[in-house]
Regions:
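Conserved beta-propeller blade signature
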Residues: 4-7, 43-45, 53, 91-94, ...
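Hydrophilic extracytoplasmic domains
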Residues: 96, 103-144
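Surface-exposed loop/turn positions within WD40 beta-propeller blades
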Residues: 2, 11, 49, 98, ...
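Short loop/turn segments that connect beta-strands within beta-propeller blades
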Residues: 18-21, 56-59, 105-109, 144
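WD40 beta-propeller blade core
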Residues: 15, 53, 102, 141-142
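Generic detector of contiguous secondary-structure segments
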Residues: 38-58
Length: 144
């Protein structure tokens, strides 16, 4: 946002750091290895365990936590990791290490769809001109 940077240090800590002074604005206990997305006053990130965190950017207050892996059996969840996510049309699109994409409603956190789109070699999703793209098996695939 020009004033702060937001990141996880992969040690269950998610930070907001003041760009000018380098001081910590706030810290939360979130284990995430993927890049967060900032929209207006909200920060979105997905933990290694598949939880979508929605936080207020200035104070770091957690507004909502949604379990995006809830439809997987415990045995599968244990080895499942998020690859990355994109946000568009009020939905969150999350790709996973098993080749699935999960579509979640951004307002409620509910899961709208889960679909197998490839094997375990898929990229995080990208949105361009209102279309969703994923790199899958070395090819760029467009979804409507």
């Amino acid at each position: 946002d020009g004033n702060s940077i937001y990141f996880s240090n992969n040690k269950n800590e998610f930070y907001s750091i003041d760009v000018k002074t380098g001081t910590t604005n706030w810290r939360n206990e979130i284990n995430s290895t993927i890049t967060p997305i900032l929209i207006k006053n909200l920060i979105f990130t997905v933990s290694e365990e598949g939880y979508l965190y929605v936080m207020e950017k200035n104070e770091g207050n957690v507004i909502r936590i949604s379990n995006l892996f809830m439809n997987y059996k415990k045995k599968i969840r244990k080895n499942l990791k998020p690859i990355g996510f994109a946000i568009g049309n009020l939905n969150l699109y999350l790709t996973n290490s098993n080749g699935d994409i999960i579509v979640s409603d951004l307002n409620s956190g509910s899961i709208l769809n889960k679909k197998k789109i490839g094997n375990n070699l898929i990229s995080r999703p990208f949105i361009y001109n209102n279309s969703l793209f994923v790199v899958r098996n070395g090819s760029i695939v467009k979804y409507n």
